[in-house]
A protein has these predicted regions:
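Generic structural hydrophobic/aromatic packing signal, biased to beta-strands
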Residues: 44, 51, 95, 115-117, ...
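C-terminal, structured domain-capping segment
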Residues: 70-99, 157-206
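Surface-exposed interaction patch
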Residues: 33-35, 77-135
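Compositionally biased, low-complexity repeat tracts
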Residues: 20-25, 43, 82, 107-108, ...
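Intrinsically disordered, low-complexity boundary segments flanking structured domains
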Residues: 35-40, 49, 98-106, 159-163
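Short, polar/proline-rich extracytoplasmic segments that appear immediately after membrane translocation
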Residues: 2-70, 186-190, 195-206
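A generic structural signal for short beta-strands and their flanking turns/coil linkers
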Residues: 47, 58, 75-77, 111
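Signature of Gram-negative chaperone-usher
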Residues: 2-15, 29-34, 58, 113-172, ...
Length: 206
């Protein structure tokens, strides 16, 4: 009998211990807790990098063709280049001139077409009869691209106000066929496209 009592008592004690543990765990869940939280949201918007040539007309003569040129002739064309207010400032603006229709006029780097780009601090004064335009500057003329062969990629442009948003540059692009161009340049045709590319300013903390 004694053995049986001990066994029974052991089972009861074990059961009570389990029940007690369960009750203890359940009791933990009934305690209250004070909490406080706060939050904030950050609005993030991206800027705009955008430069634009002027519309056709006196603010963009680049698409006006020149024909019947001979050695020594020059071709002057103007265009405005604008970085509108509200856009981002730029770290650089480059020019790529590529021939979509090619000939020796653009492939001969020495005796083919040469280009130079300058700008006027005010609007260029236009004279001449289309397409033989000429331009004078009543303000200050500044070099943007030194004389070189017409075709080139990612050519660095200097002294541009349009690096800063809200500014416009009054550009003049002048093409010249050197006097050294010989008879092999007769009867040729080239179409040269000019692409201006603006690069975003240096990244910074915002």
């Amino acid at each position: 009998m004694g053995l049986n009592l001990k066994t029974t008592t052991g089972k009861v004690i074990a059961s009570l211990a389990l029940v007690g543990t369960a009750a203890g765990v359940a009791g933990l869940g009934t305690y209250g807790a004070f909490t406080s939280s706060t939050s904030a949201s950050a609005a993030v918007g991206s800027g705009t990098v955008n430069i634009a040539l002027g519309a056709s007309g006196a603010t963009n003569r680049l698409s006006v063709a020149a024909t019947n040129i001979v050695p020594g002739d020059t071709i002057q064309r103007v265009a405005t280049l604008t970085n509108a207010a509200g856009n981002q400032n730029l770290s650089a603006i480059t020019l790529t001139a590529a021939a979509t229709t090619s000939s020796k006029l653009d492939t001969d780097a020495t005796n083919g077409l040469q280009v130079v780009v300058d700008k006027c601090s005010t609007t260029w004064t236009e004279a001449g009869t289309a397409p033989a335009y000429t331009y004078t500057c009543s303000g200050t003329t500044t070099q943007v691209l030194a004389t070189r062969a017409v075709v080139g990629a990612n050519l660095a442009l200097a002294n541009l106000s349009s690096l800063t948003a809200g500014n416009t540059d009054n550009l003049r692009v002048t093409l010249t066929l050197p006097t050294a161009a010989d008879n092999t340049f007769q009867g040729l045709n080239s179409v040269v496209g000019f692409t201006f590319t603006g690069t975003q300013r240096t990244a910074t903390n915002q």
